[in-house]
Amino acid sequence: MSAKIKSGDDIIVLTGKDKKKIGKVIKVIIRNAKKKVVVSGVNVCKRHTKPRAGSGGGIFNKELAIDVSNVAILDPKYKTPTKVGFKIIDGRKVRFAKVSGEVID
């Protein structure tokens, strides 16, 4: 099964407090038929950490996961949100942007 959003993709947030922010996908989480993505610089919270042996405590920024339905891949040509399609080129299945037809990977 091919994934429409993969690590390293440039995406834009469609809804929520970080609407219209652009970032790169750090990690894709699939758990119990729910798909979420962690995006750099988006959905950031403060994490208060207690000092432990080997590491000091403090307040750190942490990116939380966003549901995959709230993000869209950026079109490589026009830099707008786009849907993703699949086609076979030279016997290899590739993703392409539906807006411009450009191959994503």
From Swiss-Prot:
Keyword RNA-binding attributed: yes
Signal peptide residue numbers: none
GO MF terms held by the record: rRNA binding; structural constituent of ribosome
Keyword line: Ribonucleoprotein, Ribosomal protein, RNA-binding, rRNA-binding
GO annotation (BP), single: translation
Keyword flag rRNA-binding: yes
Superkingdom per UniProt: Bacteria
One of the Pfam families matching this protein, by short name: ribosomal_L24
One GO cellular component term: ribonucleoprotein complex
Assembly: Part of the 50S ribosomal subunit.
Family: Belongs to the universal ribosomal protein uL24 family.
PANTHER family: MITOCHONDRIAL RIBOSOMAL PROTEIN L24 (PTHR12903)
Physiological role: One of two assembly initiator proteins, it binds directly to the 5'-end of the 23S rRNA, where it nucleates assembly of the 50S subunit. One of the proteins that surrounds the polypeptide exit tunnel on the outside of the subunit.
Name of the featured protein: Large ribosomal subunit protein uL24
Species of provenance: Wolbachia pipientis subsp. Culex pipiens (strain wPip)
